């Protein structure tokens, strides 16, 4: 059966006054072209721009090639495409698709690539909460944490009647001698033990942790922070917090009593009969 090709061109948002189109008539191919749709999604919610706004750039503006917004966008889209290792960016810094996503197609200086290499991105990731002489990019942890919840709230046109916050800790296996490396008996490997909080498909919190702690460590504090932020927009919302996860019931009670509106604590399905409705 003869293959029928669609010769139409599909246009995307221009970058630096250059048109960006997708064609299906052959030529040089890329396996990452679908990422252009990811870029369109980002522009709809402004994720990268808002994430970049959580950083402070203390570098001399006239001397830099890669802005914080470009660095953050390059790293976010790189991870989304499966390029988790910074060393990959020594090649990806020349990739036209990633350049389109980052919004930077050409370098200002002749001796630079359009995007950053691993060393520059490493300095971004090793930044601190405060600017120092040797750390010129700082991040605001509270703003980054709040951004997850802001995106969740904005994803709802109308507040739902009830939401369920699902807390979970899982293993992030390590294959080298990374800082904070510990062996975890349950997972039978060296790993980190990150804490995640979801509401359905929405990620509300992601906390990197070492594996030498209890799985529930910090869970109540994170839940309290998220609930307080949700309450500013949805003050009458019923919030369900599963009572599993190894969190001490007494600590859950403390969290519940600290809320002005209805908060609902329940055990796992195997103990559903013992759930409690708290005010």
What is the predicted role of each segment?
Residues 164-166, 242, 264-266:
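A structural signal for short, well-ordered beta-strand segments and their strand-loop junctions
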Residues 95, 249, 269-270:
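Polar helix-capping/helix-linker motif
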Residues 217, 224, 260-279:
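Catalytic or ion-translocation cores adjacent to nucleophile or general acid/base/metal-coordination motifs
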Residues 209, 245-246, 269:
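Short beta->alpha junction loops/turns
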């Amino acid at each position: 059966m003869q293959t029928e090709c669609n010769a139409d061109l599909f246009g995307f948002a221009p970058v630096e006054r250059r048109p960006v189109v997708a064609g299906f008539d052959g030529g040089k191919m890329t396996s990452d072209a679908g990422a252009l749709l990811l870029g369109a999604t980002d522009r709809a919610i402004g994720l990268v721009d808002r994430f970049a706004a959580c950083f402070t750039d203390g570098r001399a503006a006239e001397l830099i090639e890669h802005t914080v917004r470009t660095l953050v966008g390059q790293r976010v889209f790189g991870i989304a495409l499966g390029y988790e290792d910074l060393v990959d960016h020594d090649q990806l810094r020349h990739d036209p698709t990633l350049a389109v996503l980052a919004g930077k197609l050409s370098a200002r200086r002749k001796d630079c690539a359009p995007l950053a290499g691993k060393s520059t991105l490493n300095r971004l990731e090793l930044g601190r909460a405060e600017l120092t002489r040797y750390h010129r990019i700082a991040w605001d942890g509270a703003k980054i944490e709040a951004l997850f919840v802001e995106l969740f709230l904005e994803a709802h046109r109308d507040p739902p009647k009830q939401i369920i916050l699902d807390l979970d800790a899982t293993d992030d296996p390590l294959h080298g001698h990374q800082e904070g490396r510990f062996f975890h008996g349950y997972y039978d490997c060296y790993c980190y033990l990150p804490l995640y909080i979801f509401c359905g498909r929405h990620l509300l919190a992601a906390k990197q942790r070492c594996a030498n702690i209890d799985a529930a460590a910090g869970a109540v504090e994170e839940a309290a922070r998220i609930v307080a932020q949700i309450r500013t927009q949805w003050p009458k919302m019923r919030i369900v917090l599963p009572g599993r996860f190894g969190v001490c019931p007494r600590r859950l009670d403390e969290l519940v009593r600290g809320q002005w509106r209805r908060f609902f604590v329940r055990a796992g399905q195997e103990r559903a009969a013992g759930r409690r409705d708290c005010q």
